[in-house]
């Protein structure tokens, strides 16, 4: 009888070890089987003028069958035009400000990115302007949207008169950008 009672604690330890091994295997298998989470990296352009429609391109990872954009304001809506391209309408009643946009697709809903509804004319970069002779004209009082390459220079031109005060704002933080801009203003002679 004494040998039987000493075998019980050893048997219990073996059963506990088996249960623990099973649980560890089940947890590992479950984490391997989880679907990827959609990741929205960028929305271009990052905004639009209130009362207009603009074409938006999305870039990210695991955006399989992305078929909708969800905005934090019901007055901003999107229609799928082609994979990763949407027509976004900003209703006249939308207030100037920043709103969240998320992608909805086969794998669920993505992280938010910032989309700005504004009241100024919007210009979107369509080609490189990395040399002074390729500078793009930006009218006063307008917004310029575009993506930049790290450590690259872009050139813009705008009309100005001697002694006139001009305010140039690079709103990177407002649009959730990692860019740290450096601006230099020169006259037509490059001074």
PLM features per residue range, with description:
Residues 1-13:
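N-terminal secretory signal peptides that target proteins for export/translocation
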Residues 16-28:
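Bacterial N-terminal signal peptides
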Residues 34-78, 82-83, 92, 96, ...:
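Acidic, Ser/Thr/Pro-rich low-complexity intrinsically disordered segments
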Residues 113-140:
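Predominantly extracellular/luminal regions of secreted and cell-surface proteins
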